[in-house]
Amino acid sequence: MSEMQMPEMRYILPSFVEHSSYGAKESNPYNKLFEERIIFLGTQVDDASANDIMAQLLVLEGLDPDRDITMYINSPGGSFTSLMAIYDTMQYVRPDVQTVCLGQAASAAAVLLAAGTPGKRAALPNARVLIHQPATGGVQGQVSDLEIQAKEIERMRKLMEETLARHTGKSAEQVRIDTDRDKILTAEEAKEYGIVDQVFDYRKLSAQN
């Protein structure tokens, strides 16, 4: 995916040239990660990031349906519909999807973190996970429209609760209680809650031991 769209950022993304028997090839960190079957969600969850992630999942499945895909997450969350689009694609593709939180996985991103393949969900030691109810935005319009929107908000809320319950082992009722207000978890607390399976040690420390 040499034309992969780069996330918006304030710093200059470095590029580098790789030399091989086939000649020279210019690359960048995101293309290099993709070659290693790594997807990086480092922005809010919206239609643009969802489309990019879904495309990468589908292409990586086509390249090798038997090799794991790893998704690194550092995201403040975002759109519920975009979340479910990514979620469905993660469950649809054949490869196992390992999820790793570095930085934060908040709101929609926390659900994606939990949705990784069981036993293959992790967080770095100082990662932060936040779960809460889906954001609804301003509700306005005539009475009949308000009723329709109210039903949709409740449907979204129930779907999010059932999804988190499915992947954490909690009951939907417990998830509703826990997400009624912002619930902030450390990496170890996220492990206890069932959002991740392990907290990764630093590679340097692992190498020294």
Swiss-Prot record:
Which GO terms fall under biological process for this protein? protein quality control for misfolded or incompletely synthesized proteins
Swiss-Prot/TrEMBL keywords: Cytoplasm, Hydrolase, Protease, Serine protease
A molecular function GO annotation: serine-type endopeptidase activity
Q: What family does the database annotate?
A: Belongs to the peptidase S14 family.
- The Enzyme Commission number assigned here is 3.4.21.92
Q: Identify the enzyme class.
A: hydrolase
Q: What is this protein called?
A: ATP-dependent Clp protease proteolytic subunit 2
| InterPro entries the record matches | ClpP (IPR001907), ClpP/crotonase-like_dom_sf (IPR029045), ClpP/TepA (IPR023562), ClpP_His_AS (IPR033135), ClpP_Ser_AS (IPR018215)
* Functional summary from the UniProt entry: Cleaves peptides in various proteins in a process that requires ATP hydrolysis. Has a chymotrypsin-like activity. Plays a major role in the degradation of misfolded proteins.
| Localization per record | Cytoplasm
Catalytic residues (positions):
107, 132
Per the record, GO CC terms? cytoplasm; endopeptidase Clp complex
HAMAP family per UniProt: ClpP (MF_00444)
